[in-house]
Amino acid sequence: QVVPYEGAATGVGGILRDVLCMGAKIIATADPLRFGNPNGKDKNRVKYVANEVINGIAGYGDAVGIPNIGGDVYFNDSFDENCLVNVVCLGIVKEKDIIHSFAPESAEGYDIIIVGKATDNSGFGGAAFASLILDEKDRESNRGAVQVPDPFLKNVLIRATYAVFEEARKQGIKLGFKDMGAGGIMCSTSEVCSSSDFGAEIDLSKVNVSMKDLPPYIIANSETQE
C-alpha cells in the first residue's frame, strides 16, 4: 500500500533469497494476490495499487530471469486499505546438498563474508514496519522501510552463488549461508553464529557502503533485497 511497485518487487526478491540460500536452483515463482474492491468507494486507489503490484512482480521477475508460472487473485472490501501480496518460490536441490543457515560445527575461526548490493539507508526499520498498522498519514515517513530493488544485480548474484555452492561441494567445504533479511547485518550474523553456539566480532567499518557518513546503527540494520 505504501509503495506498491517497490513493495511487490522486493517481495519477489526476498522469496528468491530464501530458496537460493538453501543451495537450491530457483526454477519458478507464483503469486496469490488479494486486493480491495475495484468497484467500491476506494476503487481508484485499489486499481492503482493492483496495477503497480502486477508491474512490480513482472519487472523484478523478468529482469532476474525467473518465470512466474501461476497464482490467483481475489478482490474484497476488507483489502481496500491493506492489500496482501503473497509470493511463492520453487527450487530444486538434492537432500544431501541442502545448505543450512547456521555455521557448521567446524566453523571456529571462519570469516563472515557479506556479498551483494552496497549498504545504504533503505530498508532500515523494515522488521518493525512489517508489524505496523498502516495509516495513510504516515505514508511518506514509511517509504524508507521499503528497499529500492535492483533485479539485474540479483540475477548476477544468483548465478555467482550457484558457482560458489558448486565449488564448495567439489572441495568439501562446509559452510553456512543466510540471506540478510529484516534487521540486516545484525540479524543475519547473530542467527548464523548463535545457532551453533558461536559468537562473532563485526567491524562495521569494513562494510561496503554507497552513502557517506552513514551512522553505525544504519549500517548494522538496513536491508536490501540484493
Describe these PLM feature segments:
Residues Q1-E226:
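Glycine/proline-enriched, intrinsically flexible loops and inter-domain linkers
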